[in-house]
């Protein structure tokens, strides 16, 4: 590996380099890359990246205990969209579902804390609407003037982000081989 890298003017850092078997898997740029017994190599969001994202969401909700629901939606939507778009290139649907559930639990605690004297049915009716056939959508209805309709702000779900696949590269193709210059 060092000879291959040195020919291209690159060096390996001994303290940062770790050689591991692909069956054990490794984390790289927030993804866990691992070969499974069925022979497939899958990339998933790593447990650490999922944990840190959930913690970021929890802290954002906790630090805005008195904020309106519309403010919460406006704060969280860019975070959810950005994280989801980064991790959409992999086997992420189960991870997205787990994180959606963690976000739901945090928002439910936020709503219960905000309205401690109200029943759980009242809280559900106020904050969790049924939109486009989907139940339990965290949403806020913004009241507008009489000449405009009220606006519904819905919290985005990671599960709604479509999973994409990268274009596969032929196994024998090598970017350093002049024969494949047209391929790359």
Model segments located where?
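Non-catalytic terminal/accessory segments
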Residues: 1-184
């Amino acid at each position: 590996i060092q000879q291959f890298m040195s020919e291209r003017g690159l060096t390996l850092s001994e303290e940062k380099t770790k050689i591991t078997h692909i069956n054990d898997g490794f984390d790289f740029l927030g993804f866990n890359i691992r070969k499974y017994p069925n022979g497939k190599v899958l990339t998933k969001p790593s447990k650490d990246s999922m944990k840190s994202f959930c913690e970021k969401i929890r802290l954002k909700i906790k630090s805005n205990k008195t904020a309106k629901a519309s403010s919460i939606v406006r704060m969280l939507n860019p975070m959810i969209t950005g994280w989801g778009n980064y991790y959409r290139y992999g086997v992420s649907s189960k991870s997205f579902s787990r994180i959606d559930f963690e976000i739901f639990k945090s928002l439910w605690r936020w709503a219960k804390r905000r309205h401690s004297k109200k029943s759980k049915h009242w809280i559900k009716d106020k904050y969790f609407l049924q939109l486009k056939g989907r139940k339990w959508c965290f949403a806020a209805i913004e009241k507008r003037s009489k000449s405009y309709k009220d606006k519904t702000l819905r919290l985005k779900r990671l599960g709604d982000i479509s999973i994409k696949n990268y274009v596969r590269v032929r196994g024998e193709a090598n970017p350093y081989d002049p024969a494949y210059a047209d391929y790359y």
